[in-house]
């Protein structure tokens, strides 16, 4: 009986020791909606506008990099998303990026152009829950 109890104790302690110490955060559909009031140019084609100057990376073929929302610009990266589309509306260039990211109250946002050029980092920028768009559970609005 002592051997059985010892064996169960070893198995139980091995199970406790093997348990992960951190639980991965679930990833959800995330939209990054960008409004550029200056530093953009109208273009012909599928997209209606692109970023200029330091916002030149905001264009087709670019990516958005989300990192943990903090005042430090070197916070850990948590997601990378792809450019979806841009349009001009009421004199403002609107760009949309889609990604999968953990649910967080804030993010830092940076854009990477097709050639690897980087924009400044914007944030911390609050995220908001989304209930009206299937597949998208949060949105990050970046006004520039």
Report the location of each language-model feature.
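Solvent-exposed serine/threonine-rich low-complexity stretches and specific carbohydrate-binding patches
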Residues: 75-89, 123-127
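Solvent-exposed strand-loop boundary residues in beta-sheet-rich modules
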Residues: 70-72, 115
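Secretory targeting and sorting signals
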Residues: 1-24
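Short Pro-Gly-centered beta-turn/loop motif in secreted/extracellular proteins
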Residues: 89-108
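Processing junctions and N-termini across compartments
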Residues: 18, 42-44, 87
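Short acidic/polar inter-strand loop motif in beta-rich domains
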Residues: 113-122
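Extracellular beta-sheet/turn segments enriched in Thr/Pro/Gly and aliphatic residues
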Residues: 122-144
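Short, surface-exposed binding/anchoring microloops in extracellular/periplasmic proteins
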Residues: 25-70
């Amino acid at each position: 009986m002592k051997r059985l109890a010892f064996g169960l104790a070893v198995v139980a302690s091995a199970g406790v020791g093997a348990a992960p110490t951190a639980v991965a955060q679930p990833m959800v559909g995330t939209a990054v909606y960008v409004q550029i009031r200056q530093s953009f140019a109208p273009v012909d084609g599928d997209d209606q506008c692109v970023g200029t100057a330091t916002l030149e990376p905001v264009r087709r073929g670019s990516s958005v990099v989300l990192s943990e929302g903090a005042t430090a610009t070197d916070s850990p990266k948590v997601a990378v998303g792809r450019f979806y589309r841009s349009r001009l509306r009421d004199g403002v260039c609107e760009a949309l990026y889609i990604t999968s990211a953990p649910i967080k109250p804030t993010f830092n946002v940076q854009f990477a152009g097709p050639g690897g050029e980087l924009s400044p980092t914007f944030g911390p920028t609050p995220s908001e829950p989304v209930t009206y768009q299937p597949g998208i559970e949060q949105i990050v609005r970046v006004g520039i």
